[in-house]
């Protein structure tokens, strides 16, 4: 059966639709014909959609939703109205059922369905569920009983039971179904997964909702074979998209060892997200030897009390240790900070900035205001009467909801300016300092740097651009 897959993500710098590509591989392995409409490259989607659908009959349309908004407290830009317009145009040119999926969809499926009007949605792994839907459609059989689906029912929504599949059952990934080379040249990197799921208890995080709380591992040889296919296309900078690459550590070590055995470590430049807690010397060394150039640690705070409130299970001392181990192994370090959760004070912010300032990190990304996703522990906590006044947004389903501790809200940006001063390592929203912009969406400094040939994780590109400018002879 012929299936259309649509990527509606048009943010710049462009990010390759990894999930959509994996879904396409699953459909092809099951014998379906797949055509991909990548709207990232279309200046006029309203014309590209009819040109794609007219003259072709499709039995199923898949819509991949990676992000529902820009996740920025300062801008709060929702992408859902644009997705809704895309669905509306598709409907005019195809009568096939439209099924949404992707990480962004899986976090808030009912809201996305209500706004976009898609027929159904897949929560979690699309490779298996969308393929099962296509198999049923090919036989003209009902598919509404399949697991992981969200369906319209009597003016409301119904979620089918969740089912997960071991990732060793994923088909081989050719990495040729989207234009990864163009994404690399215009977006600076490619993505890959070595696992799915996150068992951590962070109060704000939606990853367990989208990917499950149980970790499922990909065989290291499959991951390295996929990396080899990217390298064969001239793609040398890769971001590992796992929630936390070093959880569990033994699998991370196996991945590094397989890269080294495959002889890819000297050609590959890769970046990852990691947890600061229990980050070991052995892993730091193996990551560097296998080509790791930078790690983004989700530190969140340097204050012990706030770490506990955020559900983090490591101490400030472990943050410092992780940075030291990376420095000693030649790995660039980024710490992501999340300020403004319930209980945040001026004092906890000061302790955080002080700790980060002496951590030796290469860059420190400061997010002020916490995105509140439905279904997280934070979403329940902020419904308390004393916390509701800290909520920002949520005027309707299209408006992203954030929380900012009311006690710090009037002064937090002034305090950050005073604490950080001119330290270039800190990235945070400052309308008077575009070089500090930590919103990657439509970041013109970043877009220009990639156009000039910079590659890698976006925080590291911004670091290198700044450092090059500072050291350039006058």
Sequence positions of predicted segments:
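Acidic, low-complexity intrinsically disordered segments
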Residues: 1-233
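Radical SAM enzyme core and accessory elements
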Residues: 2-8, 50-60, 376-383, 387-474
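Acidic-and-aromatic substrate-binding clefts and catalytic sites of carbohydrate-active enzymes
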Residues: 12, 39-47, 246-250, 276-280, ...
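Short helix-capping segments at alpha-helix termini
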Residues: 31-32, 91-96, 141, 260-267, ...
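Conserved strand-turn element in the central/C-terminal portion of the radical SAM core barrel
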Residues: 39, 274-275, 302-311, 323-348, ...
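Non-cysteine beta-strand/loop elements that form the S-adenosyl-L-methionine
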Residues: 62-65, 126, 284-302, 364-370
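Catalytic cores of alpha/beta
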Residues: 109-115, 283, 343-358
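Radical SAM [4Fe-4S] cluster-binding motif and immediate context
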Residues: 171-334, 350, 354
